[in-house]
UniProtKB/Swiss-Prot annotation:
The chain crosses the membrane at residues 538-558, 573-593, 619-639, 657-677, 683-703, 714-734, 769-789, 1186-1206, 1218-1238, 1272-1292, 1299-1319, 1329-1349, 1357-1377, 1414-1434. It comes from Arabidopsis thaliana. Gene3D superfamilies: P-loop containing nucleotide triphosphate hydrolases. Keywords: ATP-binding, Membrane, Nucleotide-binding, Repeat, Transmembrane, Transmembrane helix, Transport. This is ABC transporter G family member 35. It holds the Pfam family ABC_tran. The gene is ABCG35. May be a general defense protein. Induction: Induced by cycloheximide (CHX) and cold/dark treatment. GO terms for molecular function: ABC-type transporter activity; ATP binding; ATP hydrolysis activity; mRNA binding. Residues 520-733, 1165-1379 form the ABC transmembrane type-2 domain. It is a multi-pass membrane protein. Ubiquitous with higher levels in roots. ATP 2 binds at G885, V886, S887, G888, A889, G890, K891, T892. Signal peptide: none annotated.
Amino acid sequence: MDYDPAHAMSRGGSMRQTISRSVSKASRNMEDIFNTSSRRTKSVNEDEEALKWASIEKLPTYNRLRTSLMPELGEDDVYGNQILNKAVDVTKLDGEERQKFIDMVFKVAEQDNERILTKLRNRIDRVGIQLPTVEVRYDHLTVKADCYTGDRSLPSLLNAVRNMGEAALGMIGIRLAKKAQLTILKDVSGIVKPSRMTLLLGPPSSGKTTLLLALAGKLDKSLDVSGEVTYNGYRLNEFVPIKTSAYISQNDLHVGIMTVKETLDFSARCQGVGTRYDLLNELARREKDAGIFPEADVDLFMKASAAQGVKSSLITDYTLKILGLDICKDTIVGDDMMRGISGGQKKRVTTGEMIVGPTKTLFMDEISTGLDSSTTFQIVKCLQQIVHLTEATVLISLLQPAPETFDLFDDIILLSEGQIVYQGPRDHILEFFESFGFKCPERKGTADFLQEVTSKKDQEQYWVDPNRPYRYIPVSEFASSFKKFHVGSKLSNELSVPYDKSKSHKAALMFDKYSIKKTELLKSCWDKEWMLMKRNSFFYVFKTVQIIIIAAITSTLYLRTEMHTRNEIDANIYVGSLLFAMIVNMFNGLAEMAMTIQRLPVFYKQRDLLFHPPWTYTLPTFLLGIPISIFESTAWMVVTYYSIGYAPDAERFFKQFLIIFLIQQMAAGIFRFIASTCRTMTIANTGGVLVLLVVFLTGGFLLPRSEIPVWWRWAYWISPLSYAFNAITVNELFAPRWMNKMSGNSTTRLGTSVLNIWDVFDDKNWYWIGVGGLLGFTVIFNGFFTLALTYLDPLGKAQAILPKEEDEEAKGKAGSNKETEMESVSAKKGMVLPFTPLAMSFDDVKYFVDMPAEMREQGVQETRLQLLKGVTSAFRPGVLTALMGVSGAGKTTLMDVLAGRKTGGYIEGDVRVSGFPKKQETFARISGYCEQTDIHSPQVTVRESLIFSAFLRLAKEVSKEDKLMFVDQVMELVELVDLRDAIVGLPGVTGLSTEQRKRLTIAVELVANPSIIFMDEPTSGLDARAAAIVMRAVRNTVDTGRTVVCTIHQPSIDIFEAFDELLLMKRGGHVIYSGPLGRNSHKVVEYFESFPGVPKIPEKYNPATWMLEASSLAAELKLGVDFAELYKASALCQRNKALVQELSVPPQGATDLYFATQFSQNTWGQFKSCLWKQWWTYWRSPDYNLVRFIFTLATSLMIGSVFWQIGGKRSNVQDLTMVIGAIYAAVVFVGINNCSTVQPMVAVERTVFYREKAAGMYSAIPYAISQVTCELPYVLIQTTYYSLIIYSMVGFEWKASKFLWFIFINYFSFLYWTYYGMMTVSLTPNQQVASIFASAFYGIFNLFSGFFIPRPKIPKWWVWYYWICPVAWTIYGLITSQYGDVETPIALLGGAPGLTVKQYIKDQYGFESDYMGPVAGVLVGFTVFFAFIFAFCIKTLNFQSR
C-alpha cells in the first residue's frame, strides 16, 4: 500500500493541529491507555494479560469472536497508572461502557481515528489478508432528460389540463407536444479508484448529482441513459449496486421525532455488518495459527463493530464521534414543526446514516452544506483516513472546500456543463489550466478558482498570458484538450484495458438484496414503530379524547330517557345513532392518512436504499394500531352504549364493540392505502374523500339496497360499510324488546319491519357475515397498502425547466461586455431611484429570553438567559460589514434585534439611525432583511416576485414604468435575467436551485430600494462560483452607497476580503473585534497577533479561519485570556465608542425619518397587489384547483348516477329520506374536500406572509381579503357545473326559482366550507394541527346536520347547537327550496296515508318555506364570519417564534 500513515498534514491543517494538540495535552498524560502504559505496569500485568488472551483463544469460534478485553481503570489509576483489562462479551456492552471506550480511544477525533485505523490495518497486514476493493468505471456515459421549455413549463391550470390530455393520448400512441431534450451528462468517461480520495467539483447545474446517482445505480427510470457503469468489471445488472455502494443525498430526510443516535442505530441494524464478521473470523483463525495476540483496543473495536443483531452498536458511537455528533446524540432530529438539531448537524446525520453501514463505496453529494470549514475539515480528514487505511472508494462533491480541505484529496473530477474538464491527480490540475494561460491568484483557493475558470462571466480575470489576447475558452474546448493532456491520455489508456473480473475479491460486491435476515429486519422495524408510537402519544391521546367528547355529545343527544321503543319512528332514531357511530369511528381513521403521508419521504428513502422490504414497515404499523383501536372502541362503547339505551344485553354489547373495533381497523387500512397511493396530502384528501363517497353512497343506508341503480349494485357488495351496517343493525334489532312487539301494520315483528324499511337482511347470520366482511376488508386494505408502498414511487420530482432560448448571437456579443455593463448598472442604481444613505449605531445592546425549562430543571436560579452582552458598534453607508463568530455567538440574534425582527424576549440598549432613535414602523420602510431561509411564494415567477415586492414597497410617487425599469435593473445586478420566467418552486422539490433562490432573496429586498440591508448568511449552502456571484451582487449594492451588514459563516479568502469592516463575536454574545479589515486583512491579523501567545498566521492561510481558530474557546483556555475583556481594554474599543457617540448625534439640519403612512401603498393598492399575486398563485396551482374541480365533477356524477331521477319521487317517506340523504352526502363530501384541500395552500402562503409582513410590504387585512377574494370565481365555477349535473341527474323540478336557490345555497355552502378550512389554518401553528382541529368539528357538524336526528327530536339542551351548525342550515335551505311548496300527499312509515309533503317536512324536520330569506342570510353570514375570523387571526396571531 502506497499510503504512509504518518503522511504530513497540509499547511492548512497545521494551525488547527497546533491548537488541538495543546488542548488535548492535559488529557494525554496517560497517553494511549491501552498500550503498555509504563515499564512498571508492563512487568506487573504482562503475565495476567497473556493468561486472559490464552483463555479467550480456547473458547469456541462463535464465543471467541464475541469476547474481547475491555480496559478498566483501576482504583489507583491516577497515581499508579495501572490498567486492568477484563474479558467482556462485546454484544452485551451497555451504552455507558461503549461511550467510555470511545471517549478513551478517540480523544481527538481526527488524530486518534488515524491511530486506531493504522493499528487495525497493521493487524490485517500482519497475517497477510487482502481487503476487498471496488474500482468504479464509467464509459461514454450520456444522460438526457425530456422537458418543457418557456411558458409550457409553468404549472398553470391550462398546462395541467394539456399535460393530462397528452398523457392520455400518449397511452394510445399519439404524441402531440414535442419536448426539448436536455443533455445533463455528455459522453463522460473515468475511473474512481479505491484508496484514493476523489473530489467532484463543478458549478451549479453541471451534472454533479446526476453523475453521483448514475455511479450509485440510482438514476431515475424516466431519463435516457447510454454508456455503461461497472464495478470491478461487473455491470450494474449483474449485482446489487445499491447494497455495494451508498449514495448520500444532499436532501436531509429523517424522522423528526427520533434522536440522532436512534436514527443511526436503526440504519446500522438494517445495513448489518456486511463482511466485517467474515474478515474477523479469518483474522482470528490466522492469528491463532501464528500465535499472535492482538492489541486490546483494536480487538475490541473490531469485534464490537462486527457484532450482529445488537440494538445499539459501537460503530454508531464511533460514527457519532468522528462526525462530531456525540454532543447532540440524544437530541431529536426535528423538522418544520419541531425544533431539533441545527441544519449542519442534520447534514452530518445524513452522512452518518450511510457510513454507519459496512459499505465502503461512497458517493457523497454536498455533505458540507451548513457546516463551518473546521467541521468539514475534520469529517473529510476522518474519511481520508478511512479511504487510505481501509482501501475504500469515495467520491465526494463539496460546495466551497477550504484550501486545507481541498488538499486532503488525491484526485479531482471537474465537471462543467455536463462534460468532464479534468479528472486525475490533484497535483496536475493547475498545470492543465496554466497550459491555456489561466493562473490561480495568490490569495484564492484552488477549488474556488476551478469552479470559476470554466464560467463565461468569471474566466477573464484569471487570464495571465501577456503574449496572447484573451478569448473565451468554452467548456467543450477544455474537455477535448484534456484528452490530449498527459493525465487525460493516461486515463484513456487505463480505460481501454477492461478490468479483469477474476481479480475482484469475492466480498467486494453484494449479490443479496437485503443485508440481514428478514426476521431481524422485522424486529428492527417493530422496535422503531413502537418507539415512534410512544413518542406520538400526544397524538393518540388527542384522538381518544376527541372520540370520548363526541361520544359524550352523542349520548346526551340520544339520551335513553328521551328514546322509546314503541314504533318504526322510534326505531329509526336508534338506527340513526348506530349509523352515526359507524361514521364517527370510520372518520376516526382519517388522521392515519396524514401520519402515513408525513412518514412517506423517509420510508421511500430507506426503501430505495434497500434498508428493509415494505412489509416489515406495514406489518408493525398494522399490529401496533390494534391496541389503540381496542382502547378507543372501548371508550366509545362505555360512554354511549348504556346512556343511549341500546339492548340491555352483555352479549349484544360485546358484539357491537367488535363491529366498532373492526370498522376502526378497516378505516385505518383504507386510509393507509389511500395515503400510499395518492402520496401527497392534497391528492390524498381528494382521493380519500372520493373512495369514502363510493363506500358511503353504496353502503345501503343513504339509499336502500333495492333502490341502488343496477349499474351501482355491484358496489354494494364491495362496500365495507354495507357489511358493517347490516351487522350492527341486525345485532340491535334482533333484541327481544324489538322482536316481541308487532309493527304498525301488525303483520310482522317490529324489529323485522324496521330492517325491511332499511332493506337490511333480516337474518341473524348476517352479523357474522358482516364481521367476516370487515375482517376481510381490513386484511385486503393493509395488503394493498403494502403493495402500493412496494411498487409506487414518490410524486413531485424536480422538473427541468429551460427558459425561453435567447438569440445566440446576442448572447455571444453580450458576453464580453458583461463586466462594463455591470459597472454601469451599479453606477445608475442610485440615480434611477434616489435614496438617503443612512448610518446605524447601537450602544450597549443586550438581549434576554426567559430561562429555558431544561436549564431551570438543572438548578439554574436566574429567570432570564442573556444572549447579547452589551454590544456597541456602528454600520455606515458604502461600508460592507461582516458579522462573524462561531455557532452560538449571537450573530443572527444581534441582526434580528437591530432589524426589529424578534417576536419575543427583552431588548435593552440604544439603537439609532443617523443619530435619531430607531422607530420600527419607519425603519421597516427604509431597511431590507434577507433571511437565511429563502422563503418565497412557490407558484410565481422570478420577475413576478420582484414586481410584487417593488410595487408594494417603492413609494407611491414612483411611476409604474420606473418601477418596472428598476426591477429589470435589479435582475441585471444579481444576474437573474436568464431566470426571469422560471417558477420559484418549493425548496428542494421544484423550481430554482439553492443559489438562485438566494439571489432572488437579495433581489426581493433590493427592489424595495432600502438604505440599510441586513443579510443572514447570504453565501451558506452555495458553491464557490455561486457565492462569488452573490457577493458580487452584494458588493454592487454597497457601491451604490447603501449600508450592508452580512452574517457570514466560514468565508473563503476572497469572500472575506470583499468586506470592509468586521464585527466579530464569541460564544455568549460578547464582541471581541469591531473595526476595519485592512488590505489583505492585515488590521485584523495585526490586532490578534499583538496578544502574547497567539500563533502567527501561516503563509497563504485563510485569515477568516485563522482568526476564528486563534480566538476560539480552546485558544482562550490555552492562553488563559478572555478576548472580550482584551477588546474592552483596547484602543480599538475606545475608537468605536467615540464613533458611536459621533453617530448618535444627528447631522446639522437633519430631520428624523417620517412617513405619513405605515406602508408605502394605501389599503386599496396593497389589496390590488396581493390579489395580483394570489391570482397567479391560484392559477398555477393545478394540484389544488384542478384536483378540486375533478373531485367535484366525479362527486356530482357519482351522486347523480346513484340517486338517478329520485328527486321526483315523493309518494312515501322512504323516497324523501333518500333525497335528504343525497343532499346530505353531497354537501358534506364536497364541503370537507374544499376544507381539507385549501389548508396546504394557505399554510404555504402564510410562511411567505410572515416574511413579507415583517418587511413592511402590506398589512394583514388586504392580504387576507385578497386570498378570500381569489376563492370566489373558482368556487362559482365549481358550484355552477356541480349544480347543473346534480339537479338534472337527481331529477329535481325544473323551475327557475328552485334552480337558482339550489345554486345560491350550494355556492355559499362551498364557500363557508372553504373559509372554514382557511380559518382553521389561521388559528393553528401548522397544517397538521389545522387538519386535526378541522376534523374534530366534522363529526359534530354531521351529528347536528338534521340528517341523523331531526331538529324536533333533538333534546332542548342541545337544540341551540343545531342553530349554529352551518350544515344544518344548508340542508334546511336545500330541502325547503325544493319541497317546501309541494302539496302532494305522502305515505308515512307502515304505509298509513298521511300529510302533504310540505306539512311532513315541517312536522318531521321543522323546515318551513317562509324562512328561506333568513336561511339565505345565515348562510351568507357563516361565509362572512369564517372569512372574518381568518383575517382577524392572520392579523393578530403570529406562530413564528424568533
